[in-house]
Amino acid sequence: MNRATASVEPIPRRRSEIFVRSVVWNWAGVSISLITGFLLSPYLFRKLGPEGYGIWALSFSLIEYYWLLDLGVRSATAKFVAHHWATGESTQVSEIMSTAVSYSCLIAVFMLGIVALAAPRIEGFFHISDSYHESFRALLMLMTVSWCLGLIFNLFSAAIEAVQRFDVTSRIAIITTGTRAAVWTTMLYLGYGIVALGIATLANQCLMYALNYYYFRKVLPDCRVSLRHAGFETLKKMWNYGIHTFLQTVSMMGLNQGPPILIGHFLPTEFVGFYNLPVRLLQYTVEFIGRIGVVTNVNAAALAAREESQPLAKLAEYANRYCLAIFMPLAILLWIYGDQFFRLWIGPAGAAKAAPLLPILLIGYVFAVVAQFSSSMLLLGLGKHQRYAKGLFAEAVIAVAALWLVIPRWGIIGAVWVCSILMVLNRGLFAPWLVSKTLSLGFGHYMGTIYIRPLAAAVPVIAIAYLVRATVLPGGNWLQIFTAGALSGVLYYALAYLICLDREHRSLLRTWLRQRKSEP
């Protein structure tokens, strides 16, 4: 039986090398997003103004709700393409892709018509000043067109990731992120507003969609995507898997986009921007961890297809522990220098509203997202995510209800407390409990393997960082903050190398470094 990727360059045989290579390529793409996001967010805030930036953020939050109509098809595409690719069933790969694309085309046309009719009513839900009414409506339609195209063409990206060609998707991300940053910067410098930025964003997304399809044809040349290969039985199979990821998607929308939507309903639109800035900062940085989770997902699917249970347990422990260790120096820096960072990043006026949210959000993100994201992706890759999806749905329902009561009384500070507490209870405790049950691991042991070593390495670094801030590096300029970050990173990673890395992985790292050093 011919493999669906017969013409693709061979991938290294050792699983550790494959995993590390995939993660590194993912990080390359995310690094570009992080750098451009770090530089562009304050520039957007200053050039568009608080309300303009708030409307920009609000529009993107609304668009995320369109994924309700996906019904889990994209996640099912990644799951089943990874499975059939691992077992060498190229015909089934064609059936999955053809069915997913056909369904997505129908949904895209339907969604475009609905939004065109409902745009005036959507606009009336928010506190938008008269001067921005037309701009908001135009931006909403532009982003809707982009989403409809993405619903279709992102399936090709999912298939590329499913066969573990993260080098390809990362190259696409690097190219399109770079072009978007260049175009946005130029247009803002020339004084253009949010509608012109929306047009530029749509054009850049079209470039990404074209590259997705082009590389899909190169990576999976034997895959045939056509209506005649689509089938309702295949769609039902995808729905049966995807309905739980759909529930998970709906829940994540409520958790990620619910706060800005409700803030925009109860408070002036500018508060959406103040909330969005620290959230986006953390999301940009946590995306490093998210890319490890994506690699964990497809590796888990492949291991499950080959019925290799023992490596799964190690994958669960190592992926989460190393995610936490990688992120910890940045968490320490943002915790200790958060206020100074925001004063330099967006100015004192914006920092007064946005900076107090950061430490509250850090608690939730560190313990529930960074340290446990691979847990959720592992459950997804194994197809054992049903109870996790229900837990996310419960978290989302409680969060929306609580936010409806809290935001009018305590504003955006109350909103971030609600989000962080619920995040820790569900994703920080319930998700790892599900993984421990699924893989027959002791819950206490599983949690200990994740948290004890990274936190132990962090204690002396935190003490030194507080001392440094109180004496020689108070954070009055970017050089001081970056120097403090570099110092924390060097100290922490030196300790983490000895404390967090297992002996086998230390040896693997040393071997890799020697090989790089010996290369001409």
Which role does the model predict for each range below?
Residues 3, 15-83, 103, 109-116, ...:
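Signature of the first transmembrane helix
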Residues 148-175, 190-195, 216, 363-395, ...:
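Membrane-interface junctions at transmembrane-helix termini in multi-pass inner-membrane proteins
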Residues 21-38, 197-212, 216, 232-302, ...:
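Transmembrane helical elements of multi-pass membrane transporters/channels
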Residues 119-143, 334-370, 439, 475:
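Interfacial segments at transmembrane-helix termini and the short loops linking adjacent helices
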Residues 2-19, 212-256, 299, 304-314, ...:
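Interhelical loop/hinge segments that connect adjacent transmembrane helices in multipass membrane
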Residues 141, 171-219, 241, 279, ...:
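Hydrophobic alpha-helical transmembrane segments
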Residues 71-87, 161-162, 220-225, 278, ...:
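Helix-loop junctions and terminal segments of transmembrane helices
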Residues 1-13, 436-437, 441-443, 465-520:
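Membrane-proximal transmembrane or re-entrant/amphipathic helices at the cytosolic face
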